[in-house]
Amino acid sequence: MTGKTHAICGTDTMLAITAVSFRGLPIDGHTYLPAVGLLSVAAGSYMPDIDLHRSKMGQRHKFISKHLTHRGITHTLLFPVIFIVAMLMAAAAKIPVLPELIMGFNVGWVVHILADLCNRKGVPLLWPLYRRRVHIAAFLTSTWHEYVFIILWLGVNVACVFFLLR
């Protein structure tokens, strides 16, 4: 998927989370305000492609993109787990706004991985436990397939919001 698709899907998902939990999400003694996460979700949506030298993040961080293979470690569940731990630690330390920013960043990162799971190339989701790439669909990047994917993603989010708010 392209960077724009990742940003659209990540932001849409964060908007959906915000819509169904506008007053906050109580997790482990802290009430997270997902609306604050809207500030960081697009960055999180782009970050897994820091390993791709042609991507915006890869261009900004050439040292990293030069030494990592595309859809390698950055497309696993390892980073989202690290971000969840960081989010909980920031909440426990009572650092204002930071947990929400980490939450938004993490939502963007996870949505990026989920979107790439729908691409024929797949992702090494369970690396290092399982090194093979997995995919659940075969949408082609930079074709009309990608537009269909975006419409389906937006539709699922709208349906989830509608169902959860009724």
Residue ranges of model-derived segments:
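N-terminal membrane-targeting hydrophobic helices
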Residues: 1-166
